[in-house]
Amino acid sequence: IGYPNDVESIVEAAETLLKDDNVHFLFIGSGAKRRWIENSVEQKRLTNVSLLPSRPRDDQGNFLNACDVALVSLVSGMEGISVPSRMYNIMAAGKPIIAITDPQSELALAVEEENMGWVVPPGNADRLVTVIQEARAEPLRLAEMGSRARKAAESKYAYVHVLQSYLSLFEKS
């Protein structure tokens, strides 16, 4: 939960969706923006937001299996600099992704190329709320996106495929 993450849009969306009992936000981890989230949740009385401390990577599957959709966020200007590694774990778990990121980022391109979720521009909490409501209203579409995410994880990002990509890169050198 660091500076590259657009947590502000997520907290704003949580405030808008506060009365929707079917939507809950879970932040796991620590980082530079965690205190800001804690303060915002307390000040705004966001009962639909939970914060947990960092957990062992072995526990990640439990949390991913408990969610319907996962949020991955990056502030503007991160394209070409960062792809959150959690994206690959989310894909492997077969979960659709709501990517809060610039439309030209690697994260956005992967989500759109695989049709495994939605892309929301950073700072656009209203669009995030709309996407969350769409996702909640379409469980079959969520399942299809999750299935595509899992297939992409297996066919493009599994260790054997990544290793082969590196090997072919070195063979060309």
Model segments located where?
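Nucleotide-sugar-dependent
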Residues: 5, 56-63, 70-91, 96-109, ...
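C-terminal alpha-helical cap of glycosyltransferases
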Residues: 137, 155, 159-173
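Amphipathic alpha-helical segment in the mid-to-C-terminal domain
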Residues: 57, 125, 142, 155-163
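Nucleotide-activated donor-binding/catalytic signature segment of Leloir-type glycosyltransferases, i.e.
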Residues: 18, 22-29, 34-61
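A short, well-ordered alpha-helix in the C-terminal region of glycosyltransferases
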Residues: 127, 134, 141-155
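A conserved mid-protein helix/loop that constitutes part of the nucleotide-sugar donor-binding site
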Residues: 2-16, 35, 89
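A structural motif in glycosyltransferase catalytic domains
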Residues: 6, 10-13, 25, 128, ...
